[in-house]
């Protein structure tokens, strides 16, 4: 049955119910950081509703690190920023050579990009071992079929709320998320490529281009360093969003 085939009265009833319950959860249980008491209390509230139409509901406990997923943005931004600035100071005071400075920046940026890819692209729990674990809960409900089981349908949502993303919060009219993330990630990629070329140019004759890369490519790293400031400011861990769209809508859908 297509969505357009549902009677408008049924659609309105469900929309009104969803809006009412989402508002109720936000007002009654407040900030729902992953694994905290508010989140668990809200799950118990959902369980009471699910008990009315499910054949069975249960909680499953597990260990998780609430800040591990996005706290890497703080770590990566600080380390890359400090590496670029510190190496620049050490290089221009002749404490280290330009080649060593490029090698350090190249290695640090590579590690930063690797962590970003593992966490943000592949959703691997790469940084979790570095963070404190707490007990959290999954809530599951089951509706049994009338006949033979031929296919299982899994519907999921999450009732916890995300930390505030400043790029989105302050970018309602200007696409700050796209601008700053392009600057941050794009700058890091370009810095890595330039540092590799500059390192190679120290050992392979690349003519005027190689000389230019050796002498001037480090200047671009400062653009990357400034981009890391925006990455550091990306997540506000002191503010938890209401979580209406992400993801109470999915929970009540």
Could you tell me what each predicted segment is?
Residues 1-253:
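Secretory-pathway/membrane protein signature
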